[in-house]
């Protein structure tokens, strides 16, 4: 499978608890951090849930 790089571009402050847990599950705990994951349906679903807080880096 292909991999995607995900970068946190907005702060989690003020976000609902479920979105904070999603960021934790993705491995994003600080602003401007980049993590790499395989492009599975579960990862893409998590990215879609917090799409206003993250960006896909190419």
From Swiss-Prot:
Keywords: Ribonucleoprotein, Ribosomal protein. Gene3D superfamilies: Ribosomal protein L30, ferredoxin-like fold domain (3.30.1390.20). InterPro entries: Ribo_uL30_ferredoxin-like_sf, Ribosomal_uL30_bac-type, Ribosomal_uL30_ferredoxin-like. It comes from the Bacteria. The keyword Calcium does not apply. GO terms for molecular function: structural constituent of ribosome. GO terms for biological process: translation. GO terms for cellular component: cytosolic large ribosomal subunit. The keyword Ribonucleoprotein applies. Part of the 50S ribosomal subunit. PANTHER family: LARGE RIBOSOMAL SUBUNIT PROTEIN UL30M (PTHR15892:SF2), MITOCHONDRIAL RIBOSOMAL PROTEIN L30 (PTHR15892). Belongs to the universal ribosomal protein uL30 family. This is Large ribosomal subunit protein uL30. The gene is rpmD.
């Amino acid at each position: 499978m292909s991999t995607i790089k995900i970068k946190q571009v907005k702060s989690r402050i003020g976000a609902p608890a479920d979105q904070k847990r999603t960021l934790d599950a993705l491995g994003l705990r600080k602003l401007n951090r980049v993590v790499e994951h395989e492009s599975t349906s579960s990862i893409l679903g998590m990215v879609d849930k917090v799409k206003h807080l993250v960006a896909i880096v190419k």
